Amino acid sequence: MFLDCTGFKKVLSNAIPGNDWTTPGDMLFVNSAVASQINYKDDNESQHPYVDAVAHDLGWIWKTPIKDRIGSGLCYNSSITSKQDAEDAFVEYWGKDRLRTGEFNHIDFTPGYNAKNWRANVIPVGLSSGFVEPLESSGLALMINCMAPLAGCKLMESIHQNI
């Protein structure tokens, strides 16, 4: 048994004939994101235990508050918005003075998932199994969905008993 943890490359999963990658592209219109680190305005700015998702003309913005900064990004459709336009909109939203480093991380992705998670002796895990959008909640759901069949298999019971 092999776990394919090779991310977007899906090295092991793609080697198996009949890889049924399902992309709901007609329902999910974003396929790119620009992300950066944002400074808090001041010490009183809220640090809360959830991610904000904010609608934007180009798509949507996520804001993940952590101890000393905010992780944020703008999801957009690259077929109608350039990387530069996305960066400009992101800076306009936050203000140039809030950017922590001035550096941007561009992420291009194809939303989708494996129609069947366990094929032959390969189980794709994490980004190898699918990617819907850059929020951890969907990634965690895909991870749990991939690992659930493994948790109940006889091989895992045998391994657990011998530990």
Region spans (language model):
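Short catalytic/ligand-binding loop motif for oxyanion handling, primarily in non-cytosolic enzymes
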Residues: 10-13, 114, 132-134
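Conserved structured core elements
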Residues: 54-57, 84, 103-108, 116, ...
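Hydrophobic, Leu/Ile/Phe/Ala-enriched alpha-helical segments that form helix-helix packing faces
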Residues: 90-97, 154
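Flavin (FAD/FMN) cofactor-binding core of flavoprotein oxidoreductases
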Residues: 97-124
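A conserved FAD-binding loop/helix module that cradles the flavin
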Residues: 131-151
